[in-house]
Swiss-Prot record:
Residues 1032-1043 have a biased composition (Basic residues). GO terms for biological process: cardiac muscle cell differentiation; epithelial cell-cell adhesion; regulation of heart contraction; zonula adherens maintenance. It comes from Danio rerio. Residues 678-799, 1016-1044 form a coiled coil. This is Pleckstrin homology domain-containing family A member 7. InterPro entries: PH-like_dom_sf, PH_domain, PKHA4-7_PH, WW_dom, WW_dom_sf.
Length: 1197
């Protein structure tokens, strides 16, 4: 875009200046001309256009307002669509209808237009009726500086500094990402890594302010600094060390001031050299009309008068102005009209011999000099003038020159008015896209410098416009759409119109619609008097500036900023009364932020009362056709009118504000708080959704990185890079997840508050409805009805978001998928409740796990002591329990729910059989068809070797005993011996109550969690029970035959109580538990291998066949139904049923004793089974009948 400035290579008679937008132009003092090309290199400097390698020297590429590319020849001062080397039109222009600008006179309007903000004049454009093509480049404006739209770096420009920096993202979570930064060509480029392959973005640094972060930035990162610019985005960076940060800040500040590292300052602080260099390599600003000077073609009659023949076209020159970098910084960052310049157009046949001297008052003899050769810039109305590089003054102090500046300018203006009295074309003090007074004398060259009317000069929706101008372009577009005129009349002065336009331009000097605006005082006495008789020919800003480009005159103290709103339409001007216009003296400042804060503090809009001034709209088109005197009178009348309207301003200021009652009732307060809580929930939900999106993106990127790690695992160089990226992403992911959790917690609290408030609102509504029902007064009813309507309106409005909040909160509290298995609590409470690791790892084996995971300590085996055995009794053996209870406090067991259990236990044989079945069920993990848990014992490996071999997977800390199936003989332990182990009880659970037995747990239903986790228990049917009883009876008969044949020796041996085949049932614990921290000793009883299934009770055939004795039925086995609730008919029915059952049982017992034949035991067994099935069927039938009678009685009652 630009070549290096190389000020040291400028000729002795050459100097340079800098425009408002940073463009550099060069001044030839001998020829009194300006040019965009460097005198030695022949290349433009910081011109705003692109310098392509395939273009000849002095050529650049620009873009029209519609986006079509064209080429600028600074040598011949022409533009064309045809490439100068290839002779072809660019393929990018295939979508445009190109039309070359004619070479006619100014009266003939070409099809091209002038870009207002970028000061572009092009030779061709798209048809003005093509609205679709006119919006092609609008999307490119907003994406400037990112990736494809970044500035292209010039490899030939030396790099000032490069290295790693952290940069904060501009959107989303504002994460800090590490990037490789390169500072070159006054622009900061950043890349993905140090290879600098493809640029990720670029930041043009001129006019930026680089400084460490402050508390207002809310940046807690160490070694952080920022690049700030008015009306543009603030960039935040972070270095690794303090030294790196200082180096970057120093280098970036020099680039922001467009200084090289060779700039030296003297002891007084003034520079010896001001090296104003290019701002960027590719600014992408379509500033097409970057011309050297405006050329006035030869008319029919022209008087050269001292000018050579080749100078008859009359290049408009520049007046030499010398400034210091301090003044340049003020003018660039602060002064709105610091570089507003104007072009002086000479009329044909009227150029006097002293014309050159009048254009350059510093060289004129008849006029006082504006500034001396080594002076300071002119300041009119407190505004610095056009600036360019110079040497510091050593003759007079700066303060003395500044005091004489205004007087010198006024004298010079008077001289110019006297010298140019009667001339056709004069100069104006406010340059702004106004047409020439007599366009018939000038022809339009392709390399145009003068602007056309405002209608012909719309802002170009250019290719890639920097953000510092996009707001002004949008506003000017809107301004031109409002005014439907094609061109303004050219027979008047247009001074006030230019003042208005100048105000609009100054408002956007930094691209911000809310930037301070310098508006002249409403009483333009000085301004109008000094410019009333001057007709202006303004120019495009892209023309190199001249001396006469000065801001509107007026006393410095009367210049103030308009407190306009940022989006006030462009054709409106806010005029305030004289008494409310404070005098603002703006002192020169080196910092742009000091000046801005000083101004904003002086005329803060919020400090004024609402009625302190009245906004009066002045329509710009209404000024058309009026002379300067008419316009001045019109403004004066408006001001007088406003003075009358705001005569009571002081009274209004002193008047106290009227108190406001926010809430009329408690319903209003509650509803307002509920709405506030809804707003809080909405904000939290928005933050949560953004965090979740960021988390999902990071996780997706991490998934890809994991796949790449697997793919490149054989390449260490790739894996190291991927691992580094993963660490950065994982760090960001941790922060995001932490934020998600924090926001979720806040949202849960807010949701609880919301629910509470909603409940209070519902209660209020109920109370109001009750009051309205009881109220008799119509007025009170109406008031209550209105309150109810308010509640209904608010609740209905909040119902749309309520479900969304509820879903969001529930998703955090109760996620849909639960991948982690929950730990199942032990079934039997014990003093060692800690679940083992294997139970958590393998939940499918939980059905066979023991509820008593007792850790084994090998050292405690030394402390063995014998445990006394239980005494044998005649009663059926008790099922083995996990622990032994004290006989003094037997467990209280609730009754069983089934009546069939009562019938089954009414005989001694039935009780014995059921006892045997229960014992076998426990051994085979079944109990009456119900699933049961087997005991898990912690035994050492030498004690149970068979159990260790039989287990599929046993953790090293303990061994699980094998589960015995229907045929339990295969799982018996083929080993005799005594094994004892000491078990340590948990100290924390020493004070718990004694655990309940299996029957208690079965009937009480307390362990709800385990019952839910286990599969549903299904009780065995009657047929299954009968089949099981038959198998058991056959086994008993075979055993009886064998016992009778073997004799008394074997009978006596077999009559002893057999030992349970399950080793777990052979472990008995001593009943005494003196202390919680003592050791419990478990001793294994000797186990003997039997060929047949063991017998659980003594066999005596005479006892079996005799009349059964009366057996006491425990209370827990009787149906718990009180007689108080039964009617007399039910009691009678029940007594008859019980008598019938007893009779049947006694008869069946007597028949069996009479009819049994010992010769045929098998036949007797079958007969006995048939007899046993009869009472069972009768009992079932009796139960059904009893329930039917009960239901009938209840229905009749």
């Amino acid at each position: 875009m630009a070549a290096p400035l190389r000020r040291d290579t400028l000729p002795d008679n050459g100097s340079y200046g800098v425009c408002r937008d940073g463009r550099v132009f060069f001044i030839d003092d001998e020829a009194r001309a300006t040019t965009w090309l460097h005198p030695r290199t022949g290349q433009p400097v910081n011109s705003g256009h692109m310098i392509r390698s395939d273009l000849p020297s002095g050529w650049e590429e620009g873009f029209t307002k519609e986006g079509a590319s064209f080429f600028i020849d600074h040598n011949q001062r022409t533009t064309t669509f045809i490439h100068p080397v290839t002779g072809q039109i660019s393929t990018e222009n295939s979508d445009f209808r190109l039309q070359d600008q004619p070479g006619g006179r100014m009266l003939k309007q070409p099809s091209s237009t002038i870009s207002e903000a970028s000061t572009t004049v092009t030779t061709s454009t798209v048809d003005s009726t093509s609205g679709s093509k006119g919006s092609r480049s609008s999307g490119r404006v907003h994406s400037f500086g990112k990736r494809d739209h970044a500035i292209k770096r010039n490899p030939s420009v030396p790099v000032v500094v490069r290295g790693w920096l952290y940069k904060q993202d501009s959107s989303g979570m504002r994460l800090w990402k590490r990037k490789w930064f390169v500072l070159a060509d006054f622009c900061l480029f950043y890349y993905k890594d140090s290879r600098e392959e493809s640029v990720l973005g670029s930041i043009p640094l001129p006019s930026y302010t680089i400084a460490p972060v402050g508390p207002e930035d809310h940046i807690s990162r160490k070694y952080a600094f920022k690049a700030e610019h008015t009306g543009m985005r603030t960039y935040y960076f972070s270095a690794d060390t303090q030294e790196d940060m200082n180096g970057w800040v120093r280098a970036m500040n020099q680039a922001a001031l467009m200084q090289t590292h060779t700039v030296k300052r003297d002891e007084c602080g003034h520079p010896d050299h001001v090296n104003v260099s290019e701002k960027l390599k590719k600014q992408a600003v379509p500033q097409t009309n970057h011309i050297n000077s405006y050329v006035i073609p030869k008319p029919e009659v022209i008087q050269s008068d001292g000018l050579p023949e080749d100078k008859r076209e009359g290049f408009v020159g520049e007046v030499e102005i010398q400034v210091t970098p301090r003044e340049m910084e003020q003018a660039r960052g602060k002064s709105p009209a610091s570089r507003v310049v104007e072009v002086e157009v000479l009329a044909p046949g009227s150029t006097p011999p002293s014309r050159v001297a009048s254009r350059a008052p510093s060289r004129a003899v008849s006029t006082p000099p504006v500034v001396q050769r080594n002076g300071t810039p002119i300041e009119q109305n407190g505004m610095p003038g056009c600036q360019r590089g110079a040497t510091p003054s050593a003759q007079t102090p700066v303060q003395v020159q500044r005091r004489s500046t205004l007087e010198q300018v006024e004298n010079w203006v008077k001289v110019q008015k006297e010298e140019r009295h009667g001339l056709v074309s004069t100069e104006s003090t406010v340059p702004r896209r106004t047409p020439p007074i007599h366009p018939k004398y000038g022809t339009m060259d392709k390399y145009q410098s003068l602007p056309k009317t405002s209608r012909q000069s719309p802002p170009a929706p250019h290719h890639q416009l920097p953000s510092e101008y996009k707001y002004s372009h949008d506003r000017l577009n809107h301004f031109q759409k409002i005014h439907g005129h094609t061109k303004r009349p050219t027979t008047h002065d247009n001074t006030v119109w230019q003042l208005f336009e100048w105000q609009q331009r100054q408002q956007f000097r930094h691209g911000s619609p809310s930037a301070p605006v310098y508006t002249p005082a409403p009483d333009y006495s000085t301004a109008v008097s000094s410019t009333r008789n001057n007709s202006d020919v303004s120019r495009s800003v892209s023309v190199p500036p001249t001396l006469a480009d000065i801001p509107p005159p007026g006393p410095p103290g009367a210049r103030l900023m308009s407190p306009r709103r940022p989006h006030t339409p462009a054709e409106r001007v806010t005029v305030r009364p004289l008494e409310d216009r404070p005098i603002v003296e703006v002192p020169p400042s080196n910092s742009p932020h000091r000046l801005r804060s000083y101004k904003s503090a002086t005329i803060e809009r919020r400090s004024m009362p609402p009625s302190a001034y009245i906004t009066h709209t002045v329509s710009a088109p209404s000024l058309h056709g009026k002379t300067a005197d008419d316009t001045y009178m019109h403004l004066k009348k408006d001001l007088e009118y406003l003075d009358l309207k705001v005569s009571g301003t002081e009274a209004l200021k002193g008047r106290p504000a009227k108190p406001v009652k926010v809430a009329e009732s408690d319903v209003d307060v509650t509803l307002s708080r509920l709405c506030e809580q809804d707003k809080i929930l909405q904000e939290l939900e928005f933050r949560l959704s953004g965090l979740k999106d960021d988390k999902d993106k990071l996780e997706s990127v991490l998934d890809v990185s994991h796949q790449q790690m697997e793919q490149y695992k054989d390449q260490p160089s790739h894996t190291d890079k991927i691992a580094y990226q993963q660490r950065l992403l994982q760090e960001d992911l941790v922060h995001i997840r932490a934020d998600i959790s924090r926001v979720s917690t806040e949202m849960e609290r807010a949701w609880d508050d919301y629910s509470r408030m909603e409940q209070s609102v519902e209660q209020l509504r109920d109370v109001l409805q009750t009051q309205m029902t009881l109220c008799t007064s119509p007025q009170e009813k109406n008031q209550l009805k209105r309150e109810l309507w308010r509640i209904e309106d608010v609740m209905t409005g909040l119902s749309s978001t309520k479900e969304t909040f509820k879903i969001t909160v529930d998703s955090v509290k109760n996620p849909e998928r639960k991948l982690v298995p929950s730990v199942i609590e032990s079934t039997v409470p014990s003093r060692c409740m800690t679940p083992s690791a294997a139970e958590v790892r393998s939940p499918q084996r939980s059905l066979t796990s023991s509820p008593l995971p007792l850790p084994l300590d090998n050292e405690d085996l030394r402390n063995r002591h014998p445990v006394p055995n239980w005494e044998e009794d005649d009663a059926p053996p008790r099922p083995p329990l996990p622990l032994l209870y004290d006989e003094d406090t037997p467990p209280v067991v609730p009754p069983l729910p089934k009546e069939t259990s009562v019938i089954r236990h009414t005989s001694v044989r039935g009780l014995k059989r059921q006892s045997d079945e229960r014992k076998r069920d426990r051994e085979s993990s079944y109990s009456n068809g119900d699933y049961r848990l087997e005991l898990r014992s912690y035994l050492s490996e030498p004690e149970l070797p068979v159990s260790a071999h039989g287990a599929d997977h046993v953790d090293p800390g303990y061994l699980t005993l094998q589960r015995r199936g229907l045929s339990g003989s295969s799982s018996r332990i083929n080993q005799y011996g005594v094994a004892s182990c000491s078990l340590r009880r948990d100290l924390e659970l020493s004070t718990m109550e004694r655990p309940k037995s299996a029957l208690e747990r079965l009937c009480s239903g307390e362990p709800q969690l385990e019952q839910q986790s286990q599969p549903q228990r299904v009780r065995m049917s009657v047929e299954e029970q009968l089949e099981r009883m038959k198998r058991h009876q056959r086994a008993l008969v075979r055993e009886r035959k064998r016992n009778l044949s073997q004799g008394e020796r074997h009978h006596s041996r077999a009559s002893t109580r057999p030992v349970n085949s399950d080793p777990g049932s052979a472990l008995f614990v001593e009943p005494y538990r003196p202390a919680s921290d003592e050791w419990l000793t478990v001793r294994a009883r000797p186990v003997m291998e039997l060929e047949l299934e063991p017998l659980d009770f003594e066999f005596d055939i005479t006892r079996e066949l005799s009349t059964p004795q009366k057996v006491w039925i425990p209370q827990r086995l009787i149906d718990d139904e009180s007689d108080e609730d039964l009617s007399p008919e039910e009691k009678e029915t029940r007594s008859r049923t019980v008598a019938k059952i007893k009779t049947l049982l006694s008869k069946s017992s007597m028949r069996s004793s009479e009819q049994m034949d010992f010769s045929d035991l098998d036949l007797a067994l079958q007969q006995q089974e048939r007899i046993m099935s009869v009472p069972r069927a009768l009992a079932t039938e009796a139960s059904i009948k009893r329930r039917q009678v009960t239901a009938k009685a209840m229905s009749e009652g």
